[in-house]
């Protein structure tokens, strides 16, 4: 009889192996066998837990998204109640060290590419996009009229994605300070127009 919690431990081990495999070989070079080899377990166990490569990528992205959502919630709870602080918390969560590590960044890029072709991944991306927009819009709405808050939220979401994408593609370690400064300057600029 398996140990209590072994399923969760094994899944986490395989998700970590998937992140590292995508980092080293890209999505095309990531197979159930290569993940199994990295995790030092049989391919059959990977197949048992995830079914196929699509299931493995979906589970890995659910893990990455859960980390992002938890970081966002944690940072928003810790922030002061004013809109600027809440918005900065959302930005900081998106540029958190967990989200800007090499393996996670390469997995995000693979996920975005695959989400254009796979409905289950497209749905995950849509949920992520809506959650970010909703958080930003709610916070901007505390300081701006509704239409302006929506525009500001769309602008900041695009800026977060753009800064993140440029950082991911630069081939250098992600410059968190520069990304935070640019995004926070945008927040200050938008909110200053209403102060």
UniProtKB/Swiss-Prot annotation:
Transmembrane segments: none annotated. Residues 8-68 form the HTH tetR-type domain. SUPFAM superfamilies: Homeodomain-like (SSF46689), Tetracyclin repressor-like, C-terminal domain (SSF48498). Pfam families: TetR_C_6, TetR_N. Gene3D superfamilies: Tetracycline Repressor, domain 2. Pathway: Amine and polyamine biosynthesis; betaine biosynthesis via choline pathway [regulation]. The keyword Signal does not apply. GO terms for molecular function: DNA-binding transcription factor activity; transcription cis-regulatory region binding. The keyword Transcription applies. One of its GO terms (biological process) is glycine betaine biosynthetic process from choline. Residues 31-50 bind DNA. Keywords: DNA-binding, Repressor, Transcription, Transcription regulation. Repressor involved in the biosynthesis of the osmoprotectant glycine betaine. It represses transcription of the choline transporter BetT and the genes of BetAB involved in the synthesis of glycine betaine. PANTHER family: HTH-TYPE TRANSCRIPTIONAL REGULATOR BETI (PTHR30055:SF234), HTH-TYPE TRANSCRIPTIONAL REGULATOR RUTR (PTHR30055). HAMAP family: HTH_type_BetI. This is HTH-type transcriptional regulator BetI. It comes from Paraburkholderia xenovorans (strain LB400). The lineage of its organism: Bacteria, Pseudomonadati, Pseudomonadota, Betaproteobacteria, Burkholderiales.
